[in-house]
Amino acid sequence: MKKNLIGILSFLMLTSANVLRAENIGVPAECEDVMLQAFYWNSYMAESGTNSKFGRTKWLDLLRDTAAINVNFDVVWFPPSAGPTGCGVGYSAKQYSNQDSDWGTKNKLTELINALHKGNTKVLADVVLNHRGNLTNWCNFFTDYFGSYGTFTLTQKEICRNDECFTNSKSSCYGADYKDRGANDTGDNFDGARDLDHTSEAVQNWSKAYAQWLLNTMKYDGFRYDMTLGFHGQYLKMYNEAANPYISVSELWSSIARQKQHLQECEYNTMVFDFQNKYSLKGIVDGSYGKLNKDKTYNGLRKEGLARYAVTFIDNHDTFDRGGAYGDNQFTPSTDLSSATNKNYVLQASAYMLMMPGVPCVFYPHWVSYKEEINELIAIRKRAGIHSESEVLAEESGQYKYHATIQGHRGKVIVRVGKYRSQTVPEGYELAVEGGDRGAYTVYIAMNPQGIANPSLTLPSREGKKFVENGKLYIRHGEHVYDIFGRIIQ
């Protein structure tokens, strides 16, 4: 009887845990997804300056690359698609129901989303709710038409009371009476546009309608929330509950303590970009490989036991080549990704990121610069089934080197980065990839014995012939065709 009772209690505890996990909106459990940030700063512009190195990323341009994107990525993060044209990158858009932007027309955007969906790739909308651009003066706004979700025209009463528009003499609402303003900001101020008062029912209804419209009308699958330092996390939870996105990621460029606070405010109904993990990757550049260890100060959400909520990255549109706009946050010493040195740094960081827990987000300039190598690492991650909650079984760092063993759904990997020499294949493993300057990164793989038709095959094989069919990557090797998990297809 006692054993039965213990068994029942254990079952109930597991069931409760599973229910709690299921209730985390926008946080897929044990998520195997790999994400692509499909833009960089000003990459909508015609080829000039930096843009000529990495290519333009308007909707029309990305449409030409959907086959390669579908093969390698599960989620693609788009820039803000709200318009109208003339709003640049889009982080101070003026009319959210207008999806004609500097990135392209609404029709091309819809065509691109449909093309990615055909390859089972999900699309992440960049959602800016903290602030918005104005219409003709500092304090009026375009009307948004969200179809069955409603029509909304915000006013100066929906602007935060302490916004600079009320204290700048050039503003049309300078010195407005408090009764004609919103409440005080619930987060940090952004002085580039009007900060919206999320305690306001009008702002809440507008935000919920926009989120629902993006998913159900525009057919996005999830959200990347911009500037979430600017409003309390309870409101983000409210908007996610209204829309129910597949995945939600908060941009919270701050300390681990502040990120943990945000997750608590949202009741863990979002993920966050792991900025502290990004900073730990600089150890590869400066030779301090110990920074990659979990027990180090800057190792991010994994150190806090929150890897499930981490979206890891090396660089993004704000940290890469912003002309000093955000200080010295770029991963590589320069933006010259044709440099052998920078390539070596990025590929080591990619090998680390793509073999570790969290949901890895590959930056577009890195992908287009080192497509073959990064695609190869992605395929290894997918073959082993590394996921957002994968256990790091062991890790060790020494002078100029780091290695770790990670458990996936279908196998284990050992990743080594740095100055290893005369490496021998660990017992029970096979070499999956070796690359970089003098083997600066190496991955070994050991597949679980069940369910794998040919566990000895290294994929993707440099000897095999890769081809794409119905948006999926296959490799012909000898007499057989294999998928990226090593299973014999024919």
Predicted regions and their residues:
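Active-site-proximal helices and loops of the catalytic beta/alpha 8
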Residues: 24-41, 64-70, 88-91, 97, ...
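Acidic/aromatic-lined carbohydrate-recognition and catalytic surfaces
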Residues: 23-190, 229-250, 255
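Alpha-helical scaffold elements lining the catalytic groove of polysaccharide deacetylases
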Residues: 195-210
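Positively charged n-region of N-terminal signal peptides that target proteins for export
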Residues: 1-4
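Short, glycine-anchored, charge-dense loop/turn motifs used at functional sites
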Residues: 482-487
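Bacterial N-terminal signal peptides
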Residues: 7-16
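Residue-level detector of functionally pivotal "anchor" positions at catalytic/ligand-binding pockets or at interdomain
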Residues: 448-473
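Sec/Tat signal peptide C-region and signal peptidase I cleavage site
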Residues: 18-22
